[in-house]
Amino acid sequence: MSDLISALLLGILEGLTEFLPISSTGHLLIAEQWLGRRSDFFNIVIQAGAILAICLALRQRLWSLATGLGERANRDYVLKVGVAFLVTAVVGLIVRKAGWQLPETLQPVAWALLIGGVWMLVAEHFAGKLPERDVVTWKVAIAVGLAQVVAGVFPGTSRSASTIFIAMLLGLSKRSAAADFVFMVGIPTMFAASGYALLEMYKEGGFGTENWTDVAVAFVAATITGFVVVKWLLGYIKKHRFTVFAVYRMLLGAALLLWLPAAAG
């Protein structure tokens, strides 16, 4: 398979999985086993495509918040987004300075996918018993910030899965409201993570030797696919539960756990 096709597929995969509760990092680590490992710079660029996608998909909501800061409800919402982001940033930096690294094997990813699927089913079951609420509390904001760090530390967990369901269990029980808040928090989080990673790469001597055509194709693919996925998901969860994603995660995790010993042998 050519490097260009590989880059295209990885870009599409990033766009498909970044916002669905199935773990983009986990899927990219799995895909790299067959499509080849790419540089950190390449991975940052395709995540930038996902960032652009969500900004475009939520542009009306972002504009409404920006122009409506005179209203107390909007100021309160933006402040809680900021607090969730700051919690992620501070705790995430502590974890990073402690020497955390992505796993080099797929077994932790497989377990995270499997356990995360079970978590989704259990969490939605209990959240479904709560009265439907769409108000973001400070407790929810702080918990979402912490959940983002957990998702970053354990690839396969999924940022959207961990954050949406912790928000629902803590009182933001309306699925669409939980997803809206989580996606809003994700925008500064992904911007900051990508910027920090680029700065670290620059300090270490540059951005590698990636083919710029491959990078551009992957970026565009991630942007287009991510935009479509966000718009679709926000409509889907208004009428449906996350069950299909939970089942997919459990099947994929179980399949990986069965395949890994055979592949090693």
Curated annotation (Swiss-Prot):
Its EC number is 3.6.1.27. Keywords: Antibiotic resistance, Cell inner membrane, Cell membrane, Cell shape, Cell wall biogenesis/degradation, Hydrolase, Membrane, Peptidoglycan synthesis, Transmembrane, Transmembrane helix. GO terms for cellular component: plasma membrane. It catalyses: di-trans,octa-cis-undecaprenyl diphosphate + H2O = di-trans,octa-cis-undecaprenyl phosphate + phosphate + H(+). Its main location: membrane. InterPro entries: UppP (IPR003824). The chain crosses the membrane at residues 38-58, 75-95, 108-128, 135-155, 181-201, 215-235, 244-264. GO terms for molecular function: undecaprenyl-diphosphatase activity. It holds the Pfam family BacA. It comes from the Bacteria. GO terms for biological process: cell wall organization; peptidoglycan biosynthetic process; regulation of cell shape; response to antibiotic. It is found in: Cell inner membrane. Belongs to the UppP family. Bacitracin is thought to be involved in the inhibition of peptidoglycan synthesis by sequestering undecaprenyl diphosphate, thereby reducing the pool of lipid carrier available. Catalyzes the dephosphorylation of undecaprenyl diphosphate (UPP). Confers resistance to bacitracin. This is Undecaprenyl-diphosphatase.
